[in-house]
Structure formats: C-alpha cells, structure tokens
C-alpha cells in the first residue's frame, strides 16, 4: 500500500482542497454581489436625478400650458416647500378638480376702469423669477465645512447640493426664455401683428379679473373662482394650498420620548394629517367648482386668445353671479371631488416608513456599541480568586450570549422591515406600469 496515502493524510488533503475551493467560490460570489449592488445603486441614483430634473421642469410656467386663464405651475409667491407631486397637481388642474395657478394682483380696486385694469394686467409676468429664486443661489453652511477631516456623508451632501443647484439654474433659465417669448407676443399685439392663440384675450382677462377676490392667506388678489375648504368653506388659492402638508414623522405629543434628549422608539413615530388653516380641522382638503361657461386652453372649448364674452353680457355681473351660487355644506375628506393634502403628496406613507427604518437602524447601532462596551468591560475585570474568575467568565458568557441574541433579533427585524418596503415599492411600480 506504499503509494496510497495514510487515512489522516487523505482527510487533511481533501479538507484543504475543499476549503480552498469554498474560499474561491465565496470570493467570486462576493465580487458578483458587490458588482450587482453597485449597478443597482447607480440605476437608483440615475432615476432619482431624472425625477428631480422633471420636478423642476414642471415648475416652469409656460404660456401654452393654459387652463381657463391660469397655468399648471405656481407663480412663485413662495420660495420653499415646492415638494408636492407636480404630476398629480398638473393632472388635477387639467381635469378642473383644482383651480389653476392664476397670476395674482398685488392690489385691486373695484373703482378701476376697464382700461386701467387692462393696463395693469398687460404688465403681469408669467412668474415671479426674482422672488422665487432669490434664495436659490445662497447655500447653507454645512456643519462639516470647518472640519479638517470630512466624512463621506459630507461629500455626498455636497454632490446633492450641486445637482439641486444645477436643476434650479436650468429651471430658472427655462423660465426666463418663457418670459422673453411672452414679451415678444405682447410687442406683436401692440404692433397689430399675428400673435399666438395662447396669449389670453382682453375678454378673458376682464372675465377673470373684473371682480377679483383676496386670498385670506397670502393677501393677493385672484379671479373669484378659487378653491373652497371642505370644512369651513373658506377660499384659498392653489399657490397656498400646495404649501400645506403633513408634519414630519415624530413621536406622539404625549410621549415622554418626545422631550429633548429623549430616545424615540421606531414604532411610535406618527405622521399627523394637515389641519385647516382656518378652523384647524384635520385632513384638510378643498373642492373646486370650475366656471361652466369658461373652458379655455387645455381640454377647453377654445384657446385663450379666441375667447370672446357673449354679447349683451358684462364681466362684473357674470362674476357676481358666480359669487351668488348656492352655498355648499361642509364635506368629509373622503367625499368625491375633495382634494386633500395627501392627494398631492402621496409619498407621505413612504416617508413615515423610511423614518421608522432610519430610527431602527440608529437604535441597532447604539445597541451594538453598548454591547461591545459591556464585553470589553467584562474582559478587563479581574478577580482575586479562581472561583470568582470562573463565575465572572460564566456570567460574561451569558451576557455575551444574551447580547448576541438581541443583536440577531434586531437584525432580523430590520431585514423584515427592508423586505416589506421593497415589496411595497414593487407593488407601486407595477401599479404605475
């Protein structure tokens, strides 16, 4: 049996070969998984950038995107909180379920003559560029700017700021081009030339602004057919409505962890519904009654430039008849036709889940650090006798096992949360498709 290796030699050689193959296999698997994760992260980042660019493009007021004398994008009264779903809002305005973004007047006097009113209206821009973008170029000071060693999160934040600034600059430039086109159309109108049918006619402007109403929140004047709050029936312009949203996820107000330096549990986070700015009723929503005889622009009967007021009619009397329509009763948030704050920000549930997951990961990291400190403290402790050392070793082992079990349970719980979020995203994507 000279050439046959001994039993011990065969087992060791086989074990070594098997172990080496397993190491190579694991290494290849890790490399494949790492490459797949990088590609997935890259696709996710590209999709996020694409959605951000689209969001800012949708915030540009365009002359041809006209609905009943208003537009699909805000005028620029506010500089912040433009994080509503622009695609949802545009669809609601086109379907006449939400009042369009009308160009506001800073003041209104019912004694103005028709000529005086038309002069003021002819000077209005599409968008208040300087007010809306005045703070866009000023950057907030990052907490890590003055540190010698920058964290990875710092460079990630700087990259996000750079992309956001680029999106804002692109939108600002596009808005300037729209303003230039509007001025060109107004010049052609004065010279008696052929103008675009998207330029509102004098009849349309007088029909809308002859008896303008004040929005009680921004104190600007708009056409009288504004949105009405579902609860207390107060008018509110769309520019103000899209500013209202839920509070960020937070612990309940009666929770002790809501105090400063309190430790919040992930499952206790809540997202409170938005309240009416007038009567403070929860689940704020509005209803909009479009003028039946005024359908111009997108999905309308005629273009804005082709609108003509019926003969023997007066703009002020027509608007006053609108104001005298039968008064509605308060309606529930779930009634048909009610547009709530959650309708224009449908991602509030996702934000709540993300906040809970983030807090859970933070708690898990804190638990791991605490556990490692306990283990190190246990290793450093010494006793005077062999018996006490044995008791300490046994106690330390039990503590280690208990901590390890808790960490495993926490990891499993986080894994289940991530899997639930992944499945929910897949369902949303499949429903969109």
UniProtKB/Swiss-Prot annotation:
Keyword Cytoplasm: yes
Compositional bias (Basic and acidic residues): 37-49, 308-317
UniProt biased composition (Low complexity): 377-395
Subcellular location: Cytoplasm
GO cellular component terms listed in the entry, alphabetical order: cytoplasm
Main localization, broad class: cytoplasm
Family: Belongs to the SIP5 family.
PANTHER family: PROTEIN SIP5
Function according to Swiss-Prot or TrEMBL: May negatively regulate the SNF1 kinase.
Name of this protein: Protein SIP5
Source organism (scientific name): Meyerozyma guilliermondii (strain ATCC 6260 / CBS 566 / DSM 6381 / JCM 1539 / NBRC 10279 / NRRL Y-324)
